[in-house]
């Protein structure tokens, strides 16, 4: 199915078999999971979370409690994946390189499709104290692995904020955690904190989230 967002569109597809979703606890992966559940009923979702220092497992546990109650006719199974070293997280943005490789090696063949909420970086510079993620690696992986899909790869954060806002997905803002430097709250100066704020600023919206 095709979903419009501003001057662009995204495409989502249900398949026979398990639907895999990489869920980091961040805004974009939560938005993607919500869109899938909202549009495809009675599916079996296998949720992969890379266990990293940013508190990913803590936030995704709360997210899945909420999502499973909101969409009770779907089935959800979470698989916690060991992440790689701290310097690997920039390789794929929302996923550690080692953790993503684990998913491909051990789970990919049993999935009908594997979704990632990976987005493109904003077309601007803002001051930050951490490296910007090299998100092109996820695009390259999608070209190599047929069932690995990145429907947001052509969108930056301004579009995903708009998509969540237009669909009244307030929980996407309130429950997600974007900061990579603190497992709770926000440092306000890392690249991901700045990216998130930029997305809201482009839409002239206030961010209701505090995680």
Model-derived features: positions:
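Nucleotide-activated chemistry modules centered on ATP-dependent adenylation/adenylyltransferase
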Residues: 1-211
């Amino acid at each position: 199915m095709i979903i419009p967002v501003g001057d662009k569109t995204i495409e989502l597809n249900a398949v026979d078999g398990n639907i895999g979703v990489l869920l980091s606890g961040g805004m974009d992966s939560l938005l993607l999971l919500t869109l899938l559940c909202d549009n495809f009923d009675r599916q079996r979702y296998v949720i992969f979370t890379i266990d990293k220092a940013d508190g990913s497992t803590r936030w995704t546990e709360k997210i899945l409690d909420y999502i499973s109650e909101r969409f009770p006719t779907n089935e959800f199974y979470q698989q916690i994946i060991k992440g790689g070293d701290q310097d690997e997280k920039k390789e794929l943005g929302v996923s550690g390189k080692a953790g993503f490789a684990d998913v491909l090696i051990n789970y990919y063949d049993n999935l009908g499709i594997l979704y990632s909420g990976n987005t493109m970086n904003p077309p601007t510079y803002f001051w930050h104290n951490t490296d910007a993620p090299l998100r092109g690696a996820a695009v390259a992986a999608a070209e190599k692995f047929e069932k690995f899909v990145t429907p947001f790869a052509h969108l930056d954060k301004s579009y995903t904020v708009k998509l969540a806002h237009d669909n009244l997905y307030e929980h996407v803002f309130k429950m997600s955690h974007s900061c990579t430097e603190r497992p709770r709250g926000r440092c306000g100066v890392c690249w991901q904190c700045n990216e998130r704020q930029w997305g809201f600023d482009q839409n002239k919206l206030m961010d209701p989230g505090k995680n």
